[in-house]
């Protein structure tokens, strides 16, 4: 068995160590949040957001309401445009 | 860390870009279901016509009609670009980060925050760029006043801003799985119902006749209409091209059914517990390992190519017959609804009807090849970086004290299966979409495939959640307990 | 010349190998049985139509608004 490895057992050991080191290194810098263990996109699910950044925090319900309000503001814009004729 | 990093660009924005709060606790099943649905419905509500655009028809028509289905975009509405910017940005930035082309240390919380804020700003920025490309091209009317330009801009960017936030609401755990995918699934299913059973009466032709939007309703109404013969009504229902017809409706249903079949092809690896004796189970690996994401990627790239073409031909060259740009890039042919690309770009444009294939037969080869190559490339790389590669799965096995029956090293067996599965799955999906699109579905074929894949991905998360919460759901009880 | 040939061979071989590998994989896969498939189709179909109808109601709200203001 030993003779089949060029350089003998010790080189084999070295190679193994190098391989292990490489794998360790690859594990140390994860390629995605999920690989690091923090959720995020999986193989078949695309996720954009995982963490809560220290920004301007808003409640989800507020966002939903504002989104609807935004659409209604566009409706209002239509009304203004129609009532005032050609304003823009 | 020394040196410049792309994610540091997001730093100045961190303070004032709105950020949805994470839920304090794992929300109850019913709440999540309601929030997912409401969010997607609000998205649908956004398909409202833009104010301030001309109502007369303009020369510049829709150049990206066949890309709209996948991204849930409706022309000349607030959702002109649908959810293309967030999806494309997220896919591409996450790929780049996976390749280590963008330096992000995902182990660090600050880096993850910067990365997701970067995705958010780039998507909103993309909405702004796209909006101005379309305004400048004359798509919304020529000689718009400064006021009108400003209003269209604020409407489109505002809508884009809210769309990214809606996605975030679901992504952050207030809803199920992924916001982008929930929106696609619900918007496409609504589109399907509208195309088949829509009751809205739309004036057709010069004689003031009206026809309903839904293909099935049209068939029924056609039989009773006085100005149509029985046979005429039948033929009309199957092949009218100004509104959805039954042929394309049936094709879409067949495509959806095929995806259901593909979704459930899998290899089952038998696993056993290393702790408890005699505990054995199966671990399925799906053929569609990366689901519909490979298609989303292919279509994102297509979108970029076509927008680039549109910018060069329309914005720079003005789509003038005989100009150098048009000689090289082919230019656009203006039809009643669409802008049809000519030679080089037409190679990547699916035909508007089955018979239009013969105008550019090469498209069959180039379009399918494009979908297959980009899809397979994406799937191979995505499974590697998204934290579900063979290495990650075998690590999971170890953590859960599970081993593959008959194999000492799980990762060796998995590495033989997972990359092949994802590549083959992506190729099969690409072929399916290519067939559908080449038959003239104008984006609806690709749309339904992505939608069904997304629905399955979400359903899986929903099922797991349902079981984890012990099936405590009044909604499920109301539906007779068949929600799972 | 020889190098080019080798490259060309590789260009032809890679897709062929890919198709072969994929085919082998597909053959090994477990496909849903007819009964299973019908059940899935039914569930997905009902789900799709149910969600679609809910979404369509939202679209219906749009029609009168559009009619009034556009």
Curated annotation (Swiss-Prot), chain A:
Cited Pfam families: Sec61_beta
Segments traversing the membrane: 61-81
Keyword Transport found: yes
Keyword Endoplasmic reticulum: yes
Record's keyword terms, sorted: Endoplasmic reticulum, Membrane, Protein transport, Translocation, Transmembrane, Transmembrane helix, Transport
Membrane topology: Single-pass membrane protein
Origin: domain of life: Eukaryota
Region listing for Disordered, in residue ranges: 1-41
Subunit structure: Heterotrimeric complex composed of SEC61, SEB1 and SSS1.
Protein name as catalogued: Protein transport protein Sec61 subunit beta
């Amino acid at each position: 068995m030993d003779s089949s490895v060029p350089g003998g057992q010790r080189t084999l050991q070295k190679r193994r160590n190098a391989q292990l080191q490489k794998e360790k290194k690859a594990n140390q810098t994860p390629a995605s949040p999920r690989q690091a263990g923090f959720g995020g996109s999986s193989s078949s699910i695309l996720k954009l957001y995982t963490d809560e950044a220290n920004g301007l925090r808003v409640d989800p319900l507020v966002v939903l309401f504002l989104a609807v309000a935004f659409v209604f503001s566009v409706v209002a814009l239509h009304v203004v445009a129609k009532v005032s004729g050609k304003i823009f | 860390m020394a040196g410049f990093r792309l994610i540091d660009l997001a730093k100045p924005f961190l303070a004032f870009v709105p950020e949805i709060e994470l839920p304090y606790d794992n929300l109850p099943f019913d709440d999540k279901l309601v929030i997912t649905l409401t969010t997607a419905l609000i998205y649908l509500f956004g398909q409202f016509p833009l104010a301030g655009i001309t109502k007369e028809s303009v020369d510049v028509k829709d150049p990206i009609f066949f890309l709209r289905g996948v991204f849930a975009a409706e022309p000349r509405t607030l959702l002109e670009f649908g959810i293309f910017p967030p999806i494309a940005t997220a896919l591409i930035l996450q790929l780049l980060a996976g390749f280590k082309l963008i330096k992000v240390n995902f182990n660090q919380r600050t880096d993850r925050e910067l990365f997701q804020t970067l995705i958010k700003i780039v998507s909103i920025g993309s909405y702004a760029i796209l909006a101005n490309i379309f305004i400048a091209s004359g798509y919304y009317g020529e000689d718009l006043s400064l006021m009108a330009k400003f209003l269209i801009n604020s409407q489109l960017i505002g809508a884009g801003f809210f769309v990214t936030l809606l996605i975030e609401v679901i992504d952050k755990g207030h809803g199920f799985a992924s916001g982008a995918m929930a929106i696609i699934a619900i918007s496409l299913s609504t589109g399907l119902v509208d195309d088949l059973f829509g009751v809205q009466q739309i004036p057709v032709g010069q004689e003031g006749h009206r026809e309903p939007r839904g293909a099935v309703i049209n068939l029924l109404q056609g039989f009773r209409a006085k100005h149509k013969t029985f046979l005429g009504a039948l033929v009309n229902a199957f092949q009218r091209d100004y509104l959805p017809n039954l042929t394309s409706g049936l094709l879409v249903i067949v495509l959806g059914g095929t995806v259901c079949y593909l979704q459930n092809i899998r290899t089952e690896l038998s696993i056993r517990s290393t702790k408890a004796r005699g505990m054995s189970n199966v671990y399925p690996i799906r053929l569609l390992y990366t689901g519909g994401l490979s298609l989303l990627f292919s279509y994102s790239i297509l979108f970029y190519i076509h927008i680039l073409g549109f910018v060069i031909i329309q914005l720079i060259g003005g789509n003038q017959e005989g100009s150098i740009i048009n000689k090289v890039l082919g230019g656009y042919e203006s039809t009643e609804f669409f802008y049809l690309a000519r030679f080089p770009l037409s190679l990547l444009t699916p035909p508007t009807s089955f018979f239009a294939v013969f105008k550019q037969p090469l498209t069959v080869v180039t379009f399918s090849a494009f979908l297959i190559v980009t899809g397979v490339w994406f799937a191979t790389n995505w499974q590697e970086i998204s934290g579900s590669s063979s290495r990650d799965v075998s690590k999971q096995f170890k953590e859960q004290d599970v081993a593959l029956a008959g194999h000492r090293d799980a990762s060796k067996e998995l590495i033989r299966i997972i990359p092949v599965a994802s590549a083959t799955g992506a190729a099969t999906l690409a072929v399916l979409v290519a067939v559908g699109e080449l038959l003239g579905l104008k984006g609806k074929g690709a749309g339904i495939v992505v939608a069904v894949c997304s629905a399955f991905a979400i359903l899986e998360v929903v099922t797991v959640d349902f079981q984890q919460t012990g099936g405590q759901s009044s909604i499920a009880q109301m539906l007779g307990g068949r929600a799972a | 010349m020889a190098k080019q040939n080798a490259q060309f061979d590789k260009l032809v071989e890679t897709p062929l190998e890919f198709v072969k590998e994929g085919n082998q994989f597909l053959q090994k896969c477990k496909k849903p049985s007819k009964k299973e498939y019908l059940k899935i189709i039914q569930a997905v179909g009902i789900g799709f139509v149910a969600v679609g109808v809910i979404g369509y109601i939202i679209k219906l709200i749009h029609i009168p608004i559009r009619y009034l203001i556009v």
